[in-house]
Amino acid sequence: MNKNGLWNVLKKQFLPGQTKDGEKPKLTKYHYFLFVFVLGVSFMLVSQLFSSPEKTENAKTITAVSSQHSADSKEKTAEVFKASKSDKPKDSIDDYEKEYENQLKEILETIIGVDDVSVVVNVDATSLKVYEKNKSNKNTTTEETDKEGGKRSVTDQSSEEEIVMIKNGDKETPVVVQTKKPDIRGVLVVAQGVDNVQIKQTIIEAVTRVLDVPSHRVAVAPKKIKEDS
């Protein structure tokens, strides 16, 4: 329906016809109000019809973006999980010793004048895990009366500790607050070029700072140069 058709319908419904004397119809406030109301409703219906396809398209776009974001998140989570599973936990003393030895060898060979480095690290034990605990203290006071009628109070103090556990699937695992690395008993570095006093002192200082061990636990010795056969 065009604008003129809509206008004619509204005019017939809400405007009074001509009077018997042929005079022009008089519009009251009621007619103006009713006309504006119907016109506003008509505009709302028309705008809703035109906007519905656009909203549907926007909803489809939002759904597609959300699905893509969810897929990307799952993929990233899977990558992190695979990387975590590939990391081998260090459960033995040998694992810690090998790790320290490889790290020291790699860094010491970058020092000027140092070559062909061999490292031996001796650790005290494996790592120490500190678990979260719930502590509770109890005080019990007992009134005692002896045969002579004397009274005395006896207070008994007791404390209990319980490791905090959390569910991990079908199992319960303790909550780890801190993991302490094992103490190091001694370090031996054998390399070419350490016969130079300054280079030797540099290696000792580097090892003591990296591993947090006193200098008297670090030994540095020159390596024998292999002769060509």
Curated annotation (Swiss-Prot):
Per the record, the GO terms for biological process are: sporulation resulting in formation of a cellular spore
Origin: domain of life: Bacteria
Name of this protein: Stage III sporulation protein AG
Transmembrane helix listed as a keyword: yes
Region described as Disordered: spans on this chain? 64-93, 136-159
Could you tell me the membrane topology recorded for this protein?
Answer: Single-pass membrane protein
Keywords in UniProt for this one? Cell membrane, Membrane, Sporulation, Transmembrane, Transmembrane helix
| Main subcellular location of this protein, as a coarse class | membrane
